[in-house]
Design a protein with these regions (language model features):
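Conserved catalytic-core segment of nucleotide-activated headgroup transferases in glycan assembly
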Residues: 21-34, 159-208
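Active-site and donor-binding regions of nucleotide-sugar-utilizing enzymes
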Residues: 8-164
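Serine/threonine-rich low-complexity intrinsically disordered regions
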Residues: 3, 46-49, 149, 195-196, ...
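Non-catalytic membrane-proximal stalk/linker segments that position and tether the catalytic domains
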Residues: 1-9
Length: 208
């Protein structure tokens, strides 16, 4: 790639329409702590999180010509989904199955901790250069059963967990982390919402 903005590029994304998970926090860390790294973030032009990326710089509009160019030029493709940063996840998933992949190293940041069997993430079905694990038992499980080379799964923790640490906060806290749920499904999730509200209310009462 001739253009300097695509050289030694780290391309980062989540689902392509958001910036609020491990992809965002990893990208923010790169921009704030390692400005010498040429990092860019893929996100839709009309995303509600667009301003967060514009504030950091390096936005690549999803589906644009620059997205395709960045995808094929990048040295590292970093994302919370498999086929990270692909302009079309389904298309590039099938192309990868035929051995046709972008040149960049593929880094799978994940969303959270894997606790169940997920055969579609096994090496026979998926290619990754780095499989980030957020817990030691998870790392050992993936290392021993998913079929990747020993260097691929790495226990390095999840980027968004770093944001939970606030050295200046001394009070005791109880952290509640429900499993992932699409934001649009919350209004109809009456039972889970009621259960979590009860737990939080009980916890607050117990700590007073």
């Amino acid at each position: 790639c001739c253009s300097a903005k695509y050289r030694e590029l780290w391309l980062v994304c989540e689902r392509g329409n958001d910036a609020r998970d491990n992809g965002y926090w990893f990208y923010r860390y790169l921009k704030e702590k390692h400005p010498e790294i040429n990092a860019r973030y893929v996100i839709e032009a009309d995303s509600a999180d667009r301003a967060k990326i514009e504030a950091l710089g390096g936005m690549v509009p999803r589906g644009s010509f620059s997205h395709y160019l960045a995808y094929y030029c990048a040295d590292f493709l970093v994302g919370t989904h498999v086929q990270p940063c692909a302009p079309d996840l389904i298309l590039f998933y099938h192309l990868a199955g035929k051995g046709i992949r972008a040149r960049g190293k593929q880094v799978f940041l994940q969303h959270g901790i894997i606790k169940d069997e997920m055969e579609w993430l096994h090496r026979k079905n998926m290619y990754m250069d780095l499989f980030v694990c957020g817990a030691k038992p998870e790392y050992e499980y993936i290392r021993d059963t998913f079929g990747y080379s020993e260097h691929v799964p790495q226990y390095v923790g999840l980027a968004r967990f770093d944001n939970l640490i606030r050295a200046e906060r001394k009070e005791k806290m109880i952290l509640v982390m429900p499993t992932w749920r699409g934001s649009k499904s919350w209004p109809t999730a009456a039972r889970p919402l009621c259960c979590w509200s009860t737990i939080c209310a009980s916890s607050m009462t117990a700590t007073r």
